[in-house]
């Protein structure tokens, strides 16, 4: 999802892009190496001929999946990251942008999460991303590899048909006429950042040497699940049937972030949640129902 936005942006900027992915996405403009990021031979093939910089987005990103499959999460998120760092160093990479998460910090200890927050993850997903951050720190200190760590909040935008995050789940429920289940009371709050704004941060992380270490990438505006539901109803003109289920283990009750460091480094996010949501709905409303049900298909945007 995020990778398609980043690849599209980099190609538009004239960069030569090579992609490593478990799943084949036929695209004549991209040199694709299909395989597991934890496989050193795959990475050596992908990085043969040298590389200027690496964007590391490959991960198990679902909190629920990480709790169901912690070993797989560790293999992909930790072993894969370690293998990529070693292969990237050997290939002469000058910089690496790493997609991390604010889930590395666990419960909030201050009015807003900043880069100085204590790392205290609550789930295998958060823990493996924290381990990835430590590997980035070690490679910077030991080998001089500049690593820009992006602590992303909830990313949404066009092309998220296969995702299980709240915006995708809401869109799917509206198009298919289903009931939307809220985990808990719906008052838990999250920050939402548009994929295009994340892509802009990634581009800065690749090109600006002042981007090193962690930076919080979020809108700075948090919304409760109930507020997101209201916003979706306003954009789509549809009132969803809602049920409440139990809260999820390891879920943070609040994510409120302060992106001041990223802003000071030149990041300039453009999308309000409402404007971004309108674009997401425009895409979903044009999809046929079979594609929605299957979690595939896009209209006029990177997947």
Task: Mark where each language-model region is.
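N-terminal Rossmann-fold NAD(P) dinucleotide-binding loop
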Residues: 3-4
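Conserved glycine-rich Rossmann-like NAD(P)H-binding loop of the short-chain dehydrogenase/reductase
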Residues: 15-26
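Conserved NAD(P)H cofactor-binding loop of Rossmann-fold oxidoreductase domains
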Residues: 58-61, 100-101
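C-terminal substrate-binding subdomain of Rossmann-fold SDR/epimerase-dehydratase oxidoreductases
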Residues: 174-303
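A hydrophobic alpha-helix adjacent to the NAD(P)-binding/active-site core of NAD(P)-dependent oxidoreductases
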Residues: 32, 46, 73-74, 88
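Catalytic helix-loop patch of NAD(P)-dependent Rossmann-fold dehydrogenases
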Residues: 68-83, 90, 94-95, 104-149, ...
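Conserved Rossmann-fold cofactor-binding substructure of NAD(P)-dependent oxidoreductases
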Residues: 31-53
């Amino acid at each position: 999802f995020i990778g398609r936005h980043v690849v599209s942006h980099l190609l538009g900027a004239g960069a030569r892009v090579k992609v490593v992915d478990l799943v084949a996405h036929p695209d004549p403009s991209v040199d694709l190496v299909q395989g597991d990021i934890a496989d050193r031979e795959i990475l050596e093939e992908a990085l043969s001929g040298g590389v200027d910089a690496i964007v590391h987005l490959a991960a198990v990103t679902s909190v629920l999946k990480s709790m169901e499959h912690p070993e797989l999460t560790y293999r992909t998120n930790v072993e894969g990251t370690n293998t990529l760092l070693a292969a990237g160093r050997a290939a002469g990479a000058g910089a690496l942008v790493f997609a991390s998460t604010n889930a590395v910090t666990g419960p909030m200890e201050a009015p807003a999460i900043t880069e100085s927050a204590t790392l205290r993850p609550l789930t295998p997903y958060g823990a493996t991303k924290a381990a990835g951050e430590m590997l980035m720190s070690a490679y910077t200190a030991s080998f001089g590899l500049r690593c820009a760590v992006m602590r992303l909040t909830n990313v949404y935008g066009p092309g998220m048909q296969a995702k299980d995050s709240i915006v995708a789940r809401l869109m799917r429920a509206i198009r298919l006429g289903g009931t939307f289940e809220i985990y808990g009371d719906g008052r838990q709050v999250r920050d939402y950042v548009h994929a295009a704004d994340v892509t802009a941060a990634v581009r800065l992380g690749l090109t600006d040497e002042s981007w090193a270490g962690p930076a919080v990438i979020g809108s700075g505006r948090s919304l409760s699940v109930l507020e997101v539901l209201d916003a979706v109803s306003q954009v789509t003109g549809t009132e969803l049937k809602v049920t409440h289920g139990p809260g999820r283990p390891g879920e943070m009750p609040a994510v409120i972030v302060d992106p001041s460091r990223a802003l000071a480094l030149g990041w300039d996010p453009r999308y309000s949640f409402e404007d971004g949501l309108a674009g997401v709905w425009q895409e979903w409303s044009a999809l046929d129902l079979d594609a929605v049900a299957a979690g595939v298909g896009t209209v006029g945007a990177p997947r």
